[in-house]
């Protein structure tokens, strides 16, 4: 198994974004089923408590979910009164999200096919920007962070949950990754190839994220490397061995 190597952002393969889009298009159906099961499990309440402790208090706030996938955060937060907008690069994922949220008291959530690096919203439009397991897929995560800063209101909150999944693929026994137990071997290998195409795979995170967010102009930037201990303490069908972190920042 080849080792990860540092790739300058400007030297990434031209087709990396298309490869990421293709991968998630193929996974959209099974991924949606997995999120349906997660939304009907104890994990929904676990994530609801996790997010509400770190988001602005009270309902009615506009929240942008970047890389929304099948709409799990919308299913968790829309019933709490948050005005949810989900964006994803993959049309198939957006289709799955609309269907799933229509059945989970989250029909008011809005969904758009949109690039995380180019969110087409006015400056200062959202009270919060949230994301889960997205930034590891981005060819230009610093540009994405800059755009998320732009669309946030002054005092708005950024919450990003992610992990060093590329390093974890080489570090952990993949039999421990129960969340991917039903993912086809060909897609696992496709994901592995994407890891090696992305500069972000070799970065030291969340240290890199904290540095970039401070440089952009966020304040109160904090990295919590214990998020995975809270959110993935049970080895069930949602378990991933990778050490999830949470980066929180305020505009």
Predicted regions and their residues:
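Core SAM-dependent methyltransferase catalytic element
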Residues: 216-219, 233-251
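Conserved class I S-adenosyl-L-methionine
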Residues: 2-58, 72-76, 104, 227
């Amino acid at each position: 198994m080849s080792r990860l190597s540092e790739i300058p952002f400007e030297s990434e393969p031209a087709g990396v974004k298309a490869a990421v889009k293709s991968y998630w298009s193929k996974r959209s159906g099974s991924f949606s089923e997995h999120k349906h099961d997660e939304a009907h499990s104890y994990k929904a309440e676990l994530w609801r408590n996790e997010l509400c402790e770190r988001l602005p208090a009270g309902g009615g706030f506009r929240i942008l979910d970047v890389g929304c996938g099948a709409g799990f955060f919308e299913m968790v937060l829309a019933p709490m009164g948050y005005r949810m907008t989900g964006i994803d690069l993959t049309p198939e994922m957006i289709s799955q999200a609309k269907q799933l949220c229509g059945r989970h008291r989250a029909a008011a959530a809005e969904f758009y096919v949109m690039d995380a690096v180019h969110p087409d919203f006015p400056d200062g439009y959202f009270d919060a920007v949230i994301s889960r397991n997205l930034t590891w897929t981005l060819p230009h995560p610093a540009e994405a962070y800059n755009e998320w800063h732009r669309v946030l209101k002054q005092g708005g909150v950024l919450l990003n949950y992610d992990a060093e999944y590329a390093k974890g693929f080489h570090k952990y026994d993949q039999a421990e990754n129960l969340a991917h137990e039903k993912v086809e071997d060909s897609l696992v290998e496709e994901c592995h190839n994407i890891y090696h195409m992305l500069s972000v795979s070799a970065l030291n995170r969340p240290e890199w994220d904290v540095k970039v967010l401070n440089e952009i102009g966020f304040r109160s930037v904090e990295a919590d490397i214990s998020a995975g201990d809270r959110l993935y303490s049970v080895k069930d069908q949602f378990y991933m061995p990778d050490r999830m972190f949470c980066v929180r920042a305020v505009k």
